[in-house]
Amino acid sequence: MSNSRLLWSSMTVTAALMLSACSQPADETTDTNANAPAAETTGKTIRIATEGAYPPFNYTNADGSLAGFDIDVANALCDQMQAKCEIVAQDWDGIIPGLLAQKYDAVIAGMSITAERQEKVDFSEPYFANTMVWLTNTDGGFDPMAIKDATLGGQRSTTPGAYLQDNYEGKEGNTVQLYDNYDNAYLDLKSGRSDAVLAEKVSAKSWLAENAAGFGIVGDEIDNDDNIAIAVRKGDSLKADFDKALSEIRSNGELARLEQMNFGQ
């Protein structure tokens, strides 16, 4: 849904500083601040938007609280940066416009890096890599290798949605139906109003966990270099702060733990 690198150039130090550094014993030159949070984020409140309707990445509990992998990642990053997370729900179509309007500081919502989005926002390093799958009624005869005269569902403004439009809309008698969220796409699949839904694998597996009877994933996974990252406004220094914090929670095993907890992988 839900791939650039910043190359930082180092300043040349003065000869005096070089001599001073060389005069110290090796055990005194260890960088004790390597894991320290950026001064700009310590004690800061960072407002983060998520969708709240894309399990297991993000969803809304019965009591209105937000949960899921994205929320766990956001909290882990804020802990690493010694900042306070304030996470708010925002509908998907308005999530980038809300960021640009400064309603919040970042988007952590299973958002894929795309060229179109990169024209509007900056992305952190990826924190998850996705593949897409076909989800269908197993008794319906849907064949992903020969899709014809089918109604195909997905979510608008997402990587699977764009893939459906680019590859199937108006071709071989196929119709693409895009929805505001995947909940509605899955409802139409369950009611028989669509033949298949193209979704990210983890989202499809999450839905199948409660709707396995008569439904399943068919065909091969579609790997289209779908990397999920954090969106911030163009030129915002938060990108570097998030990149540093992501590197830390990846190296200390916290990111892998959150993946296992939310996805079982």
PLM features per residue range, with description:
Residues 23-26:
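Bacterial signal peptide processing site
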Residues 46-50, 144-160:
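Short loop->beta-strand "edge-of-pocket" segments that line small-molecule binding or catalytic clefts
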Residues 94, 111-119, 165, 190-191, ...:
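A ligand-binding cleft/hinge motif common to bilobed small-molecule-binding domains
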Residues 75, 79, 84-147, 215-222:
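Acidic, polar ligand-binding/catalytic clefts
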Residues 18-21:
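C-terminal motif of bacterial Sec signal peptides marking the signal peptidase cleavage site
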Residues 60, 74-82, 160-179, 208-212, ...:
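Ligand-binding cleft/hinge of the Venus flytrap
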Residues 30-110:
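Extracytoplasmic small-molecule ligand-binding "clamshell" domains
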Residues 52, 128-136, 183, 205, ...:
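Periplasmic-binding protein-like
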